[in-house]
């Protein structure tokens, strides 16, 4: 976010950094055909956790800078790659910590605040006249950071939700691989129900949109579970396939 806001400067008047096409020369500025288009700024959860995890004041400060720099839309990452969330829901745990670079150190930043992270952004965006969107890492269920965090590490009853990968050694759960982000199997019906419930809770906020990042299978090696094989066989009209 700091890089995106480098255009901001002091003063209370909003400045149009987007309409001048003169390039700084002596020519008269001409109307920029893109001046009226939306301009988005993406607020990554981990990278901005040191500033925003426990400070509504910092959120207000940086959204004011974004408005002054000419941005029209804020996208807030509320489900990072651990699979836990930064909005109100009963279906998965809240994010309690993230790792971020502070100076030259990769540091664990804990969230001790109890106020609603997403709601703080919504409230401030409305004050600033900005549109507000939420983004989630859709099919991520955990991350190997800090010895393993997220639903797939906490709840062994959800082991079948983890994507199965076609490795040289055979079909293997993503939990037993070096993949840092532990993906769900998008084809699993219980995974779909779980995520739909999350999205219902997310949609209850006063949002202008929801971004579904990582709304996909992990990679070409996934998914090779029995569940996916059966669904694919049914889709192909009953043709039997050997994994």
Where are each of the predicted segments found?
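Bacterial Sec-dependent N-terminal signal peptides
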Residues: 5-35
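Active-site-adjacent "subsite" loops/lids of carbohydrate-active enzymes
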Residues: 32-56, 137-205
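Hydrophobic faces of well-ordered beta-strands that scaffold small-molecule active sites
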Residues: 39-43, 74-76, 132-134, 210-213
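Aromatic- and glycine-enriched glycan-recognition loops and surfaces
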Residues: 51-69, 98-128, 193
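Catalytic domains of carbohydrate-active enzymes, especially glycoside hydrolases
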Residues: 57-84, 205-209
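Conserved, mostly hydrophobic/aromatic
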Residues: 66, 74, 125, 195, ...
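Aromatic-lined carbohydrate-binding/catalytic grooves of carbohydrate-active enzymes
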Residues: 71-113
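Aromatic- and acidic-residue-enriched segments that line the glycan-binding/catalytic groove
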Residues: 86-99, 140-175, 215-243
């Amino acid at each position: 976010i700091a890089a995106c806001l480098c255009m901001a400067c002091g003063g209370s008047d909003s400045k149009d950094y987007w309409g001048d096409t003169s390039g700084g020369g002596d020519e008269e500025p001409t109307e920029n055909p893109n001046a009226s288009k939306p301009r988005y700024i993406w607020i990554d959860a981990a990278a901005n956790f040191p500033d925003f995890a426990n400070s509504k004041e910092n959120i207000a400060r940086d959204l004011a800078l974004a408005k002054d720099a000419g941005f029209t839309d804020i996208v807030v990452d509320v489900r990072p790659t651990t699979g836990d969330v930064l909005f109100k829901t009963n279906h998965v745990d809240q994010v309690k910590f993230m790792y971020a670079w502070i100076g030259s150190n990769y540091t664990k930043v804990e969230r001790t605040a109890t106020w609603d992270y997403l709601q703080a952004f919504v409230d401030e965006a409305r004050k600033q006249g900005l549109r507000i969107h939420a983004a989630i890492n859709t099919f991520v269920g955990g991350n190997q950071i800090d010895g393993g965090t997220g639903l797939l590490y906490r709840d062994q009853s959800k082991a079948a939700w983890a994507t199965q990968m076609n490795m040289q050694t055979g079909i293997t759960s993503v939990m037993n691989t070096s993949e840092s982000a532990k993906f769900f199997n998008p084809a699993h019906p219980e995974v779909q129900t779980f995520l739909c419930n999350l999205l219902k809770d997310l949609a209850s906020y006063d949002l202008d949109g929801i971004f579904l990042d990582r709304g996909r299978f992990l990679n070409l090696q996934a998914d090779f579970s029995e569940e996916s094989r059966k669904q694919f066989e049914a889709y192909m009209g009953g043709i039997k396939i050997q994994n």
